[in-house]
Structure formats: structure tokens, C-alpha cells
Amino acid sequence: RVLFRSDETFCLGKYKSKKLAEERGVHRLYIDYVKELAQFLVENGKIPMFWGDIIWNSPELMKELPESMICLNWGYAPEQREDETRAIAQTGAVQYLCPGVCGWNQWANLIENSYKNITRMCGYAAKYHGIGVLNTDWGDFGHVNDPAFSVPGMIYGAVFSWNGEKIPFAELNRMISRIEYGDTTGNYVSHLAEICGQSVFQWREAVMYYENRCLKHELEEGEDLFRGVDQAGVDAAADALRDIYKKLLESTQAMPETKKQMQLLSVTLQGIGIWNAVGLLTESMEKTGSFDM
């Protein structure tokens, strides 16, 4: 099998391909390219795979692709809708359902979001007869979080891709805490899930700010990069981070790798607090007009 991506084609139909797109249409440009590449792979004994986010807009074009082609149908929202999965299934195409562990742009993964997303997508795979589930871990703007935070999400994928029974979030987290981490209290993963909520200034907003100020990229209309960044929010997050650290310390006392886990957690929790302070400082200096990068 060969995956040749073909996703997020933001520049297709613009710049060099603008004139051709005006003549033939953006969707036609896309499907002709994918079809040519897929046919080449089939002729050479391979099974082509591609991400499905572009063809969602014109699912009927799936009928032009080789029958062996596999569509990797991704969606990462906690309340991910099933419309795209249904549309691809109705064409008779072969598809994988691809949820995610929700670590992109985060210092610590959005664990509850990943649980909701993965349970939904695995359910859609069963409902629409997908041939598999591909659980994903991405790092938008650089993979800033430690991969260890993706472990609960990876386990959710292993559980629900094979088991149609929906195990409640808290119950499954207790199981993972005990079996994966050796935490006899059963609370470790539930405490991990609290960390992400304390990021007042997000990594994505920092990157957007840099690109706007230094690279002169335009922001989306109405976008406020410092929404919710204020002294009260930063102080509340700092208090919450200290409380989470204490709870995690208690959970890790019975774990076989206490020191290793606490080193990771200490760096991450302190990092979130520092980054929140950076956001507050940047927001304050932006208001005074004295900040110059």
C-alpha cells in the first residue's frame, strides 16, 4: 500500500494553477491528478491510499478512481459529524476512518476530546463498514508536546476499534491508569486530562502572532489572538496547575517509573505556566505599543 496524501490542497487553483483551474475547475484538476497517480500505482501492483478531505466536496468523483483505492477519511472534532463518512460509503468506495489523539498545538493532549472523537469515528467505521481505523497523532506548527501524552488516546483507539461497547470515559481512564501506568489509585489519566484546560495562551495563537508580526501574514477577519488572556485567567491557571501537580504526584507514588513520569509532568506544567505569562506580557506590550520584535 502506498499513501500519497493529497490533502489540504490550499494552493490548488491559485498562483501557477489559477488559469488552468478557471478553464477546467479546481475539482477536475484535483481528481485528474489523483487518478493518474493512483492508476500508476495500481499498474505497478500497489494499493493507493489518499486522505479524503478534498473529495468530500464532490464524493461522486470517487467513482472515477480505481476500485482498490482506499480513502483515509479523517476528522478530529470531539463531536465529529458522520456526513462525510456516509457520503463516501454511498459511493461504494473503500475507506478507513481516521480519528486523532488531539495533541496538535497543545502542551498536553486534549484527552477528553480524543476520547469523544475516537469513540465516534470508530462507531462510524462499524456503521458504514469501513475496513479499518487509523488513529493519528499530528504536530501542527511543530510537535511541541511530548509524545507520551498521546498514550491514552492511542489506547482509546485500540479499545474502540475492536470493541463496539462504549466504555465510559472515567471508567476507561481508571483501567488505563492501573494497567498501562501501574497507578493503584486509578486516577492518573483523569488528572492528565485536566492539564490541557490550563493553557490560557495557546501555541497556535503564538505562531499566528509571529507570522503576522514578522512575516506579515494577514490574520483572519475578527481573529483575536489574545482572547481570554488576562491576569485573572493566568493566575487561576497557575493555581490549578499547582493543584494538578499535587494530585499527579500522589498518583505516581505507587507507579514503577515515578521519577520519569514526574520529570515529564513537572516540565510540562511549568512550561504551561511560563507560556501563559509570555502571552500576558505580549498582550500587555501590544496594548502599550512598545513591543517590537
Feature-to-residue mapping (PLM):
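Short, small-residue-biased leader/transition segments that mark boundaries at the very start
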Residues: 2-3, 293
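Active-site-proximal, well-structured secondary-structure segments within enzyme catalytic domains
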Residues: 5-27
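Substrate-binding groove of N-acetylhexosamine-processing glycoside hydrolases
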Residues: 20-293
